[in-house]
Regions:
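Residues lining hydrophobic/aromatic ligand-binding pockets adjacent to catalytic sites
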Residues: 1-192
Length: 192
């Protein structure tokens, strides 16, 4: 009741599902997760599953897990091991309408592939994990993409995680202002 209209909360699934169980036999864990999230009702935005580094691609495990996810929600996957960043995974996500998280982490930028009706971005830091401030040129590059996605009717969720020295809030505010300045009338932005 205290958030503005149109505001949604993104959630990140617990590492018990992604790092410990590695998407295997997770029905009970998924049920528990959604029992907690149901209080958000229409304010529930995408749920992120961040898979660990050094866990190699396992298409069949991912396929089984995706089938177990409840319908009517938005999900995104962030793959930290580069072996997952392949067309077969993108196709599997797209077939389920699940987003591929585009991310930037200490100089590595994942492929940017639209696999859903929304885009999910995590910016973890330009110089190292969770550190450094994004410069105007880099932000402008993201803004151009975001405006294009918004014009095409996609929702965009962008999160800054470069919070070690407090840069995340400033970068997010700057990006939001840049998106608003570059978005034509009639295209809704998250700020209104």
């Amino acid at each position: 009741e205290t958030t503005p209209n149109g505001f949604v909360f993104a959630s990140k699934a617990h590492r018990y599902i992604t790092h410990f169980k590695k998407l295997r036999n997770c029905d009970e864990s998924i049920c528990s997760l959604f029992n907690r999230l149901e209080a958000l009702e229409s304010k529930l935005g995408p749920v992120l599953f961040q898979l660990p580094p050094r866990w190699q691609v396992n298409i069949s495990r991912l396929a089984d897990f995706l089938v177990a996810l409840p319908e009517g929600h938005r999900f995104a996957f962030e793959f930290r091991d580069k072996s997952w960043l392949i067309p077969q995974v993108y196709d599997l996500l797209a077939n389920h309408g699940i987003g591929l998280c585009a991310y930037d982490l200490g100089g590595f930028r994942s492929p940017i592939v639209a696999t859903a009706d929304f885009i999910y971005i995590r910016l973890h830091g330009p110089k190292g994990p969770y550190s450094g401030s994004y410069d105007g040129r880099t932000l402008n590059g993201w803004v151009k993409r975001i405006v294009s996605w918004l014009r095409s009717g996609r929702d965009v969720y962008c999160y800054f995680d470069n919070d070690q020295l407090g840069y995340a809030a400033a970068n997010a505010t700057t990006m939001q202002q840049m998106v608003e300045r570059n978005t034509p009338d009639g295209v809704e932005t998250p700020a209104g």
